Each structure stands twice: as structure tokens, then as C-alpha cells.
């Protein structure tokens, strides 16, 4: 039997259930009371359970307490003149006890026709069942919203991973783990924001549409501004605008917002993603490594109450000092047989990149060293590791080292083999920056779609004088993945990019 043949009866059953629910809605409309909006919820499930869950049945009987809760009908057991139901709100679930004698024969008859997924409001007193479960004994119960689509089967509907992404609203209804992930995401972002403002950073908003794409090596999305009759690009990074603000005197700025890169989908990549970038005058890359390390620990501790996690079955400890290695040191940690001389030999590097099965990209010595690191060492940076001192060739916006002009004062932070942050001492020499932009334009002319454009206005800003500055970008989505044990980036983005159905 084909997959389509297996799905056909399921689809027919669903269509029949939807038709039955629509018929119920039509009858409800006739009463003139469909979709009321006058029910005032006063309690959440969690607050009721927290406040009264430990009280005995006798104690509850002596309390003249009335509660008003509302939520989605998730379970329902009709037993003659009495029934049990469970409703779910954002805070959790609570059981409702409904009797015909208490709510009235007409309301009880209506209740028996309600479907799982309907949203209801309940007013009543508190009681304990024979099994000791805190429940609400309904004095009044109302249908607030009719659900026209049946909830998926717990064991089949939720097994479809793609359905979770396409219909996140259903996933959130059915899956407590998903709800936890996105509550945790919100808490982590809030803790990051609090840390930044607590350290004197000002939050700003910079343009999402740029006349010139810049701030990162990536392929942009292109659009057209009708009123201005000009081509614009969805931003790939806010970096150049944030540095303009430092030129203007805002010495500590940050932004948490979306970036857009017209590139592929993978477990680690989504074309639309969330980044935080921050810049601090009179700081350097050493300062920012220390700051970033403290920020990540704070976010984990503040939002989730711990610094040691299990990620995909393996322990991840953020409490220990983060490692700091150069690109060559990271390569030699995995392959101590590679000598310093060999890692400075372009032909050796090309051969090893091919040996590890990676396609060779155009570039000079610095690019080849980075390609080899990505091929054989990056995935092994499980513990938090700052890879430092990147070649100038692959760091067009970073300040060159005073001791070695071939490398820059740049770091990337890797955790569980994934890049989480990228930062550097900013290049504040306008003439050097202009020359590097020219080199990037040559690379673009040679076919490198990710090479940067020449941004004349940014050069003009630098000519007014950018103080010594450190800057860093942190991938919020990848950080959330680590802290919530999510295997794919789409698990931590509410509505990820998807191919058409």
C-alpha cells in the first residue's frame, strides 16, 4: 500500500470530523452567543495548584473560594450525570469536575457535545477527588471558542517533524517540551538584555534594509524600494551601522534583531535568524572575550538556574574557563603530526583540505588555513573554545595585530563544534579599511559572491574618527539550541523557513 493510500482514510476521517464541528458551530451561532468575549479569567492553572494543591479536602471545604479559569479542553470523560475534563493554559493543566445538578441540565447537555480543542471558561470552587487531585467543581461553564479542527493523535500527529515546523501552533498546543523551549528562549533573551543594560550598554535599532550590504561575508536578499526607486538589501549584519553610532559618541551599544542571509538550510542555518551585536569603545578583543564568557554564564544561570547542561547526551560545562587557541593550535590539537612549517605551506593545506573531503575554495594562505580548521578541527571544539588571531585575509573588518601584521585581533567562540560568537578589535584606520574593501571588491569580481561591497559612507564615518573599539556578534538561535538541548535550529525558531507544501 502506498503512503498516499495509507493517508487517504485519515484525511477522510479528519474531513468528516471537521464537518461535524462546523455543524455544531452553526447550531451555536443560532443561539446568538457564539464566541463571547466577556469572560474575565482571574486565575491560571498553575496559580491555583500552587496556592491550594497541598490543602486537604476538609480544608478546601472550609474555604469560601471561587476561581475563574479558562483554557483549551484537552481531556474529557463523560459519566452519566457527572463528568471530568482537563483544560490547559500557558501555565499548565487543571482538572474540572462538572455535574448536571450544579451547572444545569441544558448547560450539561451542551458540554457533552463540546470537542477536544475547544476553549472554555469555568467558574467554581475547589475540591479534592478521591485520588487526592485538586480539581475545580464547576458552578458555571461556558464555551468561548469552537475549535473546527481536531487535535492530532498524540502518537502519530506529533511524530511528523515537518508538521511541527509548519503548524507550530499545533505543536505548541500538544507538546510541553516545545512550550518549554520557547519560554526558555524568551527568558534567555531577557537575561541577555538585562546583562547588557546592567553593564551600561544602550539598546538601539538600526536599519533592516541597506543600500549596500555589509558587516559580514554572506549573500544578501535583494529587494526594490518603489518610492525611492532603488535596489536595497535585507541586512546581513548591523555591524557598520553600530560602529557609526560609536563614531557619533554612543560608546556602548547593542542590538538584538534579525539578520537575513540568502543561503542554504541546515540543522545550524536558517536564512532568517536572530543575532545580538554589541560594541564598546576603548575595549579590545581580550576585553570582549572575558565579557562574552561572563554573559553566557549569566544567561544560563539567570534564565535556567544552572551552568552545566547535557547537550545531545554529552555534558556541557559553562562554569569552567573557556579555552583559547589559535587556528593552528586547534588544528594541531587534533593532528599533532602537522608541523608549523606545513601549516604555512599552501600546497600542503590544499592537499589536506581535499583529504578531509571538503571542496577547495579560492583564497590565499589565510583562507586555506581557515578552510583546514573548518575541515578537521572545528567540530572537535566541544568545550567552549575561543579560536583567536584569524588571518587578515578572512577578517576584513578586524584590526591587525601590532606584533604580526598577517593576523588580526579576532576571535570566534565555538561550543559543541558550532560557532556561537564572532568578535574582534575593530579596524578604526579609515585608509586601511578602504584598502581592505578594495581587496574584497577584487574577490567579488573574481566570483566570490560573499565578498563585501565597498561602503563609501562607512569610510567617511571612520574618517571622523572611531575610538579604539571592540565588537562582538552572538548567534542567539544557536545559543538557545545549546541551552535547551535542541538538535536543529528550526527547533528554536517559532516559524522557521520552509519549502512550499
UniProtKB/Swiss-Prot annotation:
- Disulfide bond positions: none
The broad enzyme category this protein falls into is ligase
Name the cofactor(s) required for activity, per the record: Mg(2+)
Question: What does the entry list as the binding residues for Mg(2+) 1?
Answer: 412, 419
Q: Does Cytoplasm show up as a keyword for this record?
A: yes
Query: What reaction(s) does this enzyme catalyze?
Result: tRNA(Lys) + L-lysine + ATP = L-lysyl-tRNA(Lys) + AMP + diphosphate
State the free-text cofactor note: Binds 3 Mg(2+) ions per subunit.
Top-level taxon: Bacteria
Mention one GO biological process in which this protein takes part, according to its record: lysyl-tRNA aminoacylation
Its subcellular locations are: Cytoplasm
Q: Give the EC number.
A: 6.1.1.6
List the keywords (alphabetical).
Aminoacyl-tRNA synthetase, ATP-binding, Cytoplasm, Ligase, Magnesium, Metal-binding, Nucleotide-binding, Protein biosynthesis
Q: Name one GO cellular component term.
A: cytosol
Q: Where does Mg(2+) 2 bind?
A: 419
- Does the entry feature the keyword Cell inner membrane, yes or no? no
Q: Name one GO molecular function term.
A: lysine-tRNA ligase activity
Matching entries from InterPro entries are given as: Aa-tRNA-synt_II, aa-tRNA-synth_II, aa-tRNA-synth_II/BPL/LPL, Lys-tRNA-ligase_II, Lys-tRNA-ligase_II_N, Lys-tRNA-synth_II_C, NA-bd_OB-fold, NA-bd_OB_tRNA
Q: Which family does it belong to?
A: Belongs to the class-II aminoacyl-tRNA synthetase family.
Q: How does it assemble?
A: Homodimer.
Cross-referenced PANTHER family: LYSINE--TRNA LIGASE, CHLOROPLASTIC_MITOCHONDRIAL, LYSYL-TRNA SYNTHETASE
Know the name of this protein?
Lysine--tRNA ligase
Amino acid at each position: 500500500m502506498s503512503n498516499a493510500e495509507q493517508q487517504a482514510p485519515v484525511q477522510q476521517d479528519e474531513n468528516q470530523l471537521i464537518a461535524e464541528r462546523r455543524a455544531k458551530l452553526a447550531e451555536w451561532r443560532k443561539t446568538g452567543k457564539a464566541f463571547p468575549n466577556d469572560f474575565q479569567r482571574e486565575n491560571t492553572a498553575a496559580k491555583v495548584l500552587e496556592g491550594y494543591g497541598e490543602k486537604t479536602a476538609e480544608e478546601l471545604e472550609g474555604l469560601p473560594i471561587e476561581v475563574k479559569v479558562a483554557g483549551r479542553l484537552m481531556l474529557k470523560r463523560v459519566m452519566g450525570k457527572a463528568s471530568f475534563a482537563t483544560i490547559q493554559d500557558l501555565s499548565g493543566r487543571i482538572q474540572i469536575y462538572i455535574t448536571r445538578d450544579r451547572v444545569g441540565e441544558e448547560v450539561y447537555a451542551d458540554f457533552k457535545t463540546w470537542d477536544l480543542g475547544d476553549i472554555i471558561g469555568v467558574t467554581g470552587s475547589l475540591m479534592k477527588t478521591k485520588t487526592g487531585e485538586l480539581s475545580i467543581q464547576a458552578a458555571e461553564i461556558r464555551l468561548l471558542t469552537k475549535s473546527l479542527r481536531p487535535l492530532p493523535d498524540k502518537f502519530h500527529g506529533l511524530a511528523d517533524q515537518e508538521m511541527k515546523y509548519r503548524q507550530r501552533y499545533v505543536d505548541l498546543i500538544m507538546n510541553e517540551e516545545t512550550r518549554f523551549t520557547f519560554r526558555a528562549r524568551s527568558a534567555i533573551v531577557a537575561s541577555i538584555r538585562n546583562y547588557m543594560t546592567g553593564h551600561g550598554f544602550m539598546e538601539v535599532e538600526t536599519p533592516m534594509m541597506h543600500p549596500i550590504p555589509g558587516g559580514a561575508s554572506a549573500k544578501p536578499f535583494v529587494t526594490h524600494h518603489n518610492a525611492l526607486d532603488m535596489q536595497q538589501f535585507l541586512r546581513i549584519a548591523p555591524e557598520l551601522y553600530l560602529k557609526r553610532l560609536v563614531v557619533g559618541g554612543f560608546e556602548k551599544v547593542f542590538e538584538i534583531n534579525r539578520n537575513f542571509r540568502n543561503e542554504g538550510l541546515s540543522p545550524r542555518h536558517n536564512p532568517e535568524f536572530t543575532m545580538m551585536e554589541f560594541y564598546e569603545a576603548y575595549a579590545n578583543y581580550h576585553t570582549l572575550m572575558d565579557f562574552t564568557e561572563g554573559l553566557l554564564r549569566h544567561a544560563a544561570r539567570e534564565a535556567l538556574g544552572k551552568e552545566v547542561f547535557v547537550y545531545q547526551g554529552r555534558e556541557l560545562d559553562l562554569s569552567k574557563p573557556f579555552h583559547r587557541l589559535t587556528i593552528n593550535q586547534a588544528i594541531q590539537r587534533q593532528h599533532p603530526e602537522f608541523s608549523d612549517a606545513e601549516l604555512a605551506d599552501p600546497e600542503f593545506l590544499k592537499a589536506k583540505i581535499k583529504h578531509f573531503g571538503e571542496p577547495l575554495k579560492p583564497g590565499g594562505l589565510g583562507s586555506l588555513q581557515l578552510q583546514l580548521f573548518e575541515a578537521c578541527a572545528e567540530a572537535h571544539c566541544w568545550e567552549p573554545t575561543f579560536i583567536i588571531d584569524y588571518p587578515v585575509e578572512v577578517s576584513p573588518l578586524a584590526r591587525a595585530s601590532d606584533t604580526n601584521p598577517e593576523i588580526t585581533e579576532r576571535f570566534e567562540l565555538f561550543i559543541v563544534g558550532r560557532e556561537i560568537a564572532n568578535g574582534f578589535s575593530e579596524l578604526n584606520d579609515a585608509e586601511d579599511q578602504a584598502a581592505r574593501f578594495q581587496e574584497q571588491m577584487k574577490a567579488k569580481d573574481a566570483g566570490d559572491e560573499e565578498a563585501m561591497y565597498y561602503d563609501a559612507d562607512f569610510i567617511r564615518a571612520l574618517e571622523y574618527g572611531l575610538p579604539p573599539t571592540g565588537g562582538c556578534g552572538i548567534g542567539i538561535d544557536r545559543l538557545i539550541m545549546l541551552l535547551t538541548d535542541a538538535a536543529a535550529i528550526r527547533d528554536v525558531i517559532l516559524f522557521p523557513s520552509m519549502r512550499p507544501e
